[in-house]
Curated annotation (Swiss-Prot):
It catalyses: sn-glycerol 3-phosphate + NAD(+) = dihydroxyacetone phosphate + NADH + H(+); sn-glycerol 3-phosphate + NADP(+) = dihydroxyacetone phosphate + NADPH + H(+). Catalyzes the reduction of the glycolytic intermediate dihydroxyacetone phosphate (DHAP) to sn-glycerol 3-phosphate (G3P), the key precursor for phospholipid synthesis. One of its GO terms (biological process) is phospholipid biosynthetic process. Belongs to the NAD-dependent glycerol-3-phosphate dehydrogenase family. This is Glycerol-3-phosphate dehydrogenase [NAD(P)+]. NADPH binds at T11, W12, R32, K107, A142, R257, V281, E283. HAMAP family: NAD_Glyc3P_dehydrog. It is an enzyme of class 1 (oxidoreductase). The keyword ATP-binding does not apply. SUPFAM superfamilies: 6-phosphogluconate dehydrogenase C-terminal domain-like (SSF48179), NAD(P)-binding Rossmann-fold domains (SSF51735).
Length: 359
């Protein structure tokens, strides 16, 4: 029987463990403390933030021993907040073997380094294991998946062989996995869309309507594509499941933590108050700060990101930020300093259609 070790008793970690265990694979969930492990093992129901009728599947167990959790695993899957990835992979690294896949399920960028999670993992593990790194990302709202609703995700790695190997471990009846070798694009799509989800929450909180939200999402995707291309991503990846797909799901659902934060900001609540009272992390808050600084250092115009940043960190009025974003000032849709989107998406001269021979 294949075994998957999951680092992180987060909603997403438990959701992924449930998917894999229902497939008949052994899942070992690592809890950071013995008390948490005992609580989860005895109650078989993790926390109040999961559906009331949820219980651990038969093949999913919990341990506080990291050695026990990882021993014999085919994959170590890290479902931790992005700012906790480095300390967790440092703990895991000495226990890895060359046969183990190392998969990140986090959607964020590291504060201070602006690194993607696969880069953080690469920093901390033996170079001999680098080929085993993969990432999971896509339009995956955990609560929908736990209710048995269908979803699709993307497994990305530097090689198709590694991506397919990971996808086979995770694919289940209602959870399909596509593969991709554009690991940069898949990670950036999953991370940067959280910024736009904050904005979508602001639009919904202000009752500005679907036209405004559609405009925000579309302009947001343009910014994601611009920054992604500047960092080496394939723009087509950002138009796929890990980019546009995840963007639509996160911006459209009340289940999204980032969307929730945006809505709450329009009610006059402070960011600190909102974050303090959340049971899970809204990754977009830290990602906004990282992306904002990256855009400044690269001299990229990213007005959506800039305005969301000002709301989060400069106490800007959400209503004023929304007004600014809806004021196009008759600029070209693909215009932006150093975006180079004209080069990527420029219209090619149409070929002359040959005339048909009437005979």
């Amino acid at each position: 029987m294949s075994k998957v070790c999951i680092i992180g008793t987060t909603t997403w970690g438990i959701t992924l463990g449930t998917i894999i265990a229902h497939k008949g694979r052994e899942v070992m969930l690592w809890a950071r403390t013995e008390d948490e492990a005992v609580l989860l093992s005895t109650q078989r129901r993790p926390a109040d933030f999961l559906p009331e009728n949820y219980h651990f599947p038969e093949f999913m167990n919990v341990t506080a021993s990291l050695e026990e959790a990882i021993a014999g695993a085919d994959m170590v899957l890290l479902a931790v907040p992005s700012q906790r990835m480095r300390p967790n992979i440092r703990l895991v690294a000495p226990l890895l073997t060359k046969s183990m896949l190392i998969c990140s399920a986090a959607k964020g960028l590291e504060i201070g380094t602006a690194k993607r999670m696969s880069q953080v993992i690469t920093d901390e593990i033996s170079p001999d294991f680098a080929k085993n790194i993969c990432v999971l990302s896509g339009p995956n709202l955990a609560m929908e998946i736990l209710k048995g609703l269908p979803a699709v995700t993307v497994l990305a790695a530097d090689t198709e062989k590694t991506a397919k190997k990971a996808a086979k471990l995770i694919t289940a009846a209602n959870f399909s996995a596509y593969t991709n070798t554009d690991i940069i694009g898949v990670e950036l799509g999953g991370s940067l869309k959280n910024i736009i989800a904050l904005g979508a929450g602001i639009v919904d909180g202000l009752n500005l309507g679907n036209n405004a939200k559609s405009a925000l999402i579309t302009r947001g995707l343009t910014e994601i594509s611009a920054l992604g291309a500047a960092l080496g991503a394939n723009p087509l990846t950002l138009s796929g499941l890990a980019g546009l797909g995840d963007l639509i799901a996160t911006c459209s659902s009340n289940l999204s933590r980032n969307h929730f934060v945006g809505v709450e900001l329009t009610k006059g609540r402070s960011l600190n108050d909102i974050m303090y009272n959340m049971s899970n992390v809204a990754e977009g808050v830290s990602t906004t700060a990282v992306a904002y600084e990256m855009a400044r250092s690269m001299d990229l115009e990213m007005p959506v990101t800039e305005n969301i940043y000002n709301v989060l960190y400069n106490n800007a009025d959400p209503k004023e930020a929304a007004r600014i974003l809806m004021d196009a000032q008759a600029t070209h849709e693909l215009a932006g300093r150093k975006w180079n989107l004209f080069k990527m998406f420029r219209k090619r001269k149409a070929r002359k259609t040959p005339e048909l021979n009437p005979d």
